[in-house]
Design a protein with these regions (language model features):
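Beta-rich carbohydrate-recognition modules and glycan-binding surfaces
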Residues: 102-289
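Glycan-association/targeting regions that enable binding to alpha-glucans and other polysaccharides
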Residues: 1-126, 130-136
Length: 289
């Protein structure tokens, strides 16, 4: 089992960790990149070290981590048997008849590049939408703004609930964990918003289950910049909806915990609506700078 790091900085070591479980312990676990070939005279590899339990770990040197995309697979070796992941094929990538092109990928960016939290490329983007207290009719539409701008996502809500509240959430921990230095120096939450609903709030949910939001002011050139110092602890919406329905829709914290950027797990946007009236938001990328 292995989950690749989403994004890392170029020129810095990359730690790769995997869980290898089976009836027998492997003789070795090896990392190969997409640069290897049966036809090459030399094919560099990185041996993963046993770290206890079922865990194996390796460090890819900074010299190999260049801007672009680092692609690799992991080969589990036992005797004369080889099994390559993520494909699960019982062969080695160096076998002449190995044809599987499936690889794990980690994006590699310049260390000065802003920390991306959300990029719009389709109508999904791992973005979840919810409504409290009950439900709403929702519609997503990808707006192509080429050639001058990147696409944006238009989301429309319509609820019959009295005083509905609409939520957009995206789990981002895996995407930002590979750039801890950039995360630590982030000072502003930035949103590309083409259409902003009244009362829009944006912020984060942390690993403690606490929510920190700030009100969005008018955009400058469609960009809203929120200093992280303006985030304030608030109630956490329990989404998806809590059942049975008589349960409170919110976790209401009794203890004040200061916001800590290293504890960010999810991104959240929210705004209130009016029963029977359509509400709309159109967003592009979201990042920290």
């Amino acid at each position: 089992n292995h989950s690749p790091v989403g994004t890392v900085d170029a020129g810095k070591d990359l730690t790769i960790q995997a869980t290898v479980a089976g009836n027998e312990q492997p003789d070795s676990v090896i990392i190969y990149t997409d640069k290897i070939s049966f036809w090459n005279e030399k094919n560099p590899s990185i041996k993963m070290n046993y770290a206890g339990g079922y865990t194996y770990r390796a460090i890819v040197p900074a010299s190999d981590i260049k801007e672009g995309c680092f692609r690799y697979n992991i080969v589990v070796c036992r005797g004369d048997k080889r099994q390559t992941f993520p494909s699960g094929v019982a062969k080695s990538p160096l076998d002449w008849d190995y044809t599987t092109a499936t690889l794990w990928e980690t994006n590699v960016v310049a260390s000065t590049k802003p920390l991306s939290l959300l990029e719009v490329g389709d109508t999904d983007n791992n973005l979840e939408v919810y409504t409290l207290p009950e439900w709403s009719r929702t519609n997503r539409e990808l707006i192509e703004n080429a050639p001058t701008e990147r696409p944006t996502l238009r989301i429309t809500f319509e609820s019959k609930d009295p005083n509905p509240v609409f939520f957009l959430r995206c789990y981002i921990k895996d995407d930002i964990s590979g750039r801890p230095e950039r995360l630590a120096v982030g000072r502003k939450l930035c949103l590309h918003v083409k259409k902003m609903p009244e009362g829009l709030k944006a912020g984060f949910i942390t690993s403690d289950g606490y929510t920190y939001l700030a009100s969005c002011t008018a955009a400058t050139d469609d960009i809203i910049r929120i200093p992280l110092t303006e985030l304030r602890q608030t109630n956490t919406a329990l989404l998806p909806h809590a059942y049975p329905v008589f349960l409170d829709n919110y976790f209401r914290p009794q203890t004040e915990i200061p916001f800590q950027v290293e504890k960010i797990e999810s991104l959240e946007l929210s705004f209130e609506g009016t029963a029977g009236q359509q509400a709309e938001i159109e967003i592009g990328g979201i990042w920290l700078e």
